[in-house]
């Protein structure tokens, strides 16, 4: 086992604070409407330009082990805030740096770190309650657009496109962000349920212009195994032909004789059918087939529940107003499913989202909810170069998370004003313990730091602006984008309450742990001896 370097007291705490400052100083320059860019070198490809706090934080590793521990703890503040609220990572980092800096003064002066931490925790709890009281609901498209714009570094186009997407697919709908093909941002909305499987044969195409197979008022057959024998399908095909309606077959696969017969029937105009593979794999495939069954009012024909393909009737088939099948996607529009059953299914999936542990599972379950509830919106981010597109995409994703958070817990005045106003809750907070009261004072001063940093990044004088904002009341604050004072909410400078709350809670949590640290242990790097040169190789005998 390698030897360890064990250090104690103020000296090692100072090293930890140095690490905090290096990381926080790199992140804080991105805060506010006039935040600067950070350029990150990449091992492959061009450099990455970003204004996203958590992206900057994740890139930082320091050479000194003790400084690096401090930096990694603040990195945790940024990534935790990002996980919970999706935005506010820079604010959280600035708050953590400020609480640590203020707190260290008191620890060095001989106050009890544990009591300081208790005071900080009590102050944060009071601030969180006050933030809940001053938050107002975020319902209108205009407010959603404003939140999106602020989060995307005052890019109004981004706010507008997110508000439009939310209007079209609902606040619960899935909105994804992709690379665009043009210079402008574009919004694509897929109505109905879409899954990523297309036709199994191009001979099913009946709309040559769009290169899709379009079925009006079709039946939908759902089967969880492969279909290769046409005899299994004949009874149900005959019933569909008598009804004179088209048929979509969704199965694990349709191959061989069965696929050939369907294609021939289609070409001759005997029966309009299209076959596609079922989406997903394994258990997810079964779940998605069940979703489609509920959406279309049919059942999944599965031997597991005692149903067989030969005995299927029209009652087992789902129905829809229209289905469009392309090369890679199938879209079911207006399924004939029962609304109450669809709602029950959505509620069941939401329950699964709450218990899911992995982000991937949550994302897939969220997509299923959106598909059942009515649509998916895709924001295609346009830019002139790949480097610009990456930077823009980061901002759009941040803005999307911020708007979701705003819809969830409401909005407060932006620009660091909400935290200043919430300080009113601390003025009469007395703990009965001098050291804990000092902890409250630490938070009282730290909540000024986001506004100070926003003003500094905009080239203003932080102390002058903070004093002027404190003289005002309510939502009165400083709009760093335009350089004006006034009602922040009326000026459209809004922050989601959830983002402000999580930034404060996570910053205080890690800062409190740092203040109560008295010993740090790191591995001593071993000097590995250089590999000796290989000895000369013996001469080779003459070759014939």
Swiss-Prot record:
Keywords: ATP-binding, Chaperone, Cytoplasm, Isomerase, Nucleotide-binding. Its main location: cytoplasm. One of its GO terms (biological process) is response to heat. One of its GO terms (molecular function) is isomerase activity. ATP binds at residues 30-33, 51, 87-91, 415, 495. HAMAP family: CH60. This is Chaperonin GroEL. NCBIfam families: GroEL, PRK00013.1, PRK12849.1, PRK12850.1, PRK12851.1. The lineage of its organism: Bacteria, Pseudomonadati, Pseudomonadota, Betaproteobacteria, Neisseriales. Belongs to the chaperonin (HSP60) family. Together with its co-chaperonin GroES, plays an essential role in assisting protein folding. The GroEL-GroES system forms a nano-cage that allows encapsulation of the non-native substrate proteins and provides a physical environment optimized to promote and accelerate protein folding. It catalyses: ATP + H2O + a folded polypeptide = ADP + phosphate + an unfolded polypeptide. Pfam families: Cpn60_TCP1. The gene is groEL. Forms a cylinder of 14 subunits composed of two heptameric rings stacked back-to-back. Interacts with the co-chaperonin GroES. Its EC number is 5.6.1.7. Disulfide bonds: none annotated. InterPro entries: Chaperonin_Cpn60_CS, Cpn60/GroEL, Cpn60/GroEL/TCP-1, GroEL-like_apical_dom_sf, GROEL-like_equatorial_sf, TCP-1-like_intermed_sf. SUPFAM superfamilies: GroEL apical domain-like (SSF52029), GroEL equatorial domain-like (SSF48592), GroEL-intermediate domain like (SSF54849). Present in outer membrane vesicle formulations which are used as vaccines in human. It is found in: Cytoplasm. It comes from the Bacteria. The keyword Isomerase applies. Gene3D superfamilies: GroEL, GroEL-like equatorial domain, TCP-1-like chaperonin intermediate domain. One of its GO terms (cellular component) is GroEL-GroES complex.
């Amino acid at each position: 086992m390698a030897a360890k370097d064990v250090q104690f007291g103020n000296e090692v705490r100072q090293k930890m604070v140095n690490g905090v400052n290096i990381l926080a100083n790199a992140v804080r320059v991105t805060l506010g409407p006039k935040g600067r860019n950070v350029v990150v070198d990449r091992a492959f490809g061009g450099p990455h330009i970003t204004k996203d706090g958590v992206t900057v934080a994740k890139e930082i590793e320091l050479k000194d082990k003790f400084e690096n521990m401090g930096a990694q703890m603040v990195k945790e503040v940024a990534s935790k805030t990002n996980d919970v609220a999706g935005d506010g990572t820079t604010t959280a980092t600035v708050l953590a740096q400020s609480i640590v800096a203020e707190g260290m003064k008191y620890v060095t002066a001989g106050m009890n770190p544990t009591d300081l931490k208790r005071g900080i925790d009590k102050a944060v709890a009071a601030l969180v309650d006050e933030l809940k009281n001053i938050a107002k609901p975020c319902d209108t498209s205009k407010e959603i657009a404003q939140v999106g714009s602020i989060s995307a570094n005052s890019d109004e186009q981004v706010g507008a496109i997110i508000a439009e997407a939310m209007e079209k697919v609902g606040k619960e709908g899935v909105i994804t962000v992709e690379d665009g093909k043009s210079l402008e941002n574009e919004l694509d909305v897929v109505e109905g349920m879409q899954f990523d499987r297309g036709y199994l044969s191009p001979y099913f195409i009946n709309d040559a212009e769009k290169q899709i197979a379009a079925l009006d008022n079709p039946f939908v057959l759902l089967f969880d195994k492969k279909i290769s024998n046409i005899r299994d399908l004949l009874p149900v095909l005959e019933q569909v032909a008598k009804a004179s309606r088209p048929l979509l077959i969704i199965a694990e696969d349709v191959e061989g004789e069965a696929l050939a017969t369907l294609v021939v029937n289609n070409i001759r105009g005997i029966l309009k059918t299209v076959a596609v593979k079922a989406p997903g794999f394994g258990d997810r495939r079964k779940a998605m087939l069940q979703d489609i069954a509920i959406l279309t009012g049919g059942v999944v024909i599965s031997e597991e529940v005692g149903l067989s393909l030969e005995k299927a009737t029209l009652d087992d088939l789902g129905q829809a107003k229209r289905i469009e099948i392309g090369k890679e996607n199938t879209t079911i529009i207006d399924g004939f499913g029962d609304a109450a059953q669809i709602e029950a299914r959505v509620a069941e999936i939401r329950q699964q989202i709450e218990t899911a542990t992995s982000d991937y599972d949550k994302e897939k379950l969220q997509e299923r909810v959106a598909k059942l509830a009515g649509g998916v919106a895709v924001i295609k981010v346009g830019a002139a170069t790949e480097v610009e597109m990456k930077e823009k995409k980061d901002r759009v994703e941040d803005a999307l998370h911020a708007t979701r958070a705003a819809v969830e817990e409401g909005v407060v005045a932006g620009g660091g004003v909400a935290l200043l106003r919430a300080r009113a809750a601390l003025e009469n907070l007395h703990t009965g313990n001098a050291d804990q009261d000092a902890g409250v004072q630490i938070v009282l001063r730290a909540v000024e730091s986001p506004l100070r940093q926003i003003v500094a990044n905009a080239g203003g004088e932080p102390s002058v602006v903070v004093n002027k904002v404190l003289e005002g009341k309510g939502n009165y604050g400083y709009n760093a984008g335009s350089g004006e004072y006034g009602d922040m909410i009326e000026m459209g400078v809004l922050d989601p309450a959830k983002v402000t709350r999580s930034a404060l809670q996570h910053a205080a949590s890690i800062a409190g742990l740092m203040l109560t640290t008295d010993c740090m242990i790191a591995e001593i790097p071993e000097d590995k001896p250089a590999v000796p040169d290989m000895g000369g190789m013996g001469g080779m005998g003459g070759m014939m």
